[in-house]
């Protein structure tokens, strides 16, 4: 539970920095480390609220997240998280697809494109996990050129990972690998 408290604290700090950025009108705020969370802190709030915060942060950047690199990296990230435990049940695949097409930011893209890219990555991961993972991480790494997009890809993965109310160690590991591919310290997201 301490990890969720730390992530929640970081999300609040990040959200506050986004509010400050919006107030300045520059549109080019810092997306650096949002640390400050304390392991073991108990400032209330639930996992659902944390996921809601990530969704809000993504929605606030919706107009900046329209590139093909973000779209492709997000779908690779969603697939990597879904298959992190080495399997993707049909119900899980459907649930993640529903999350993808209902996500406010991802609605910048045609739903069929999103489903196709997500399912393509899932199929590759299930056929040969190591090769599929390497391919997914290559696609994710392409978003590293734009730090705001790179962080949004990680947040998208965290929304998917936390959607079922738990954040499994295999999902945390997948997020850490994606952070490494994006040149973002995993500690920035508490993983």
For each of these PLM feature ranges, what is it?
Residues 1-80, 90-191:
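Small-residue-enriched hydrophobic alpha-helices in membranes
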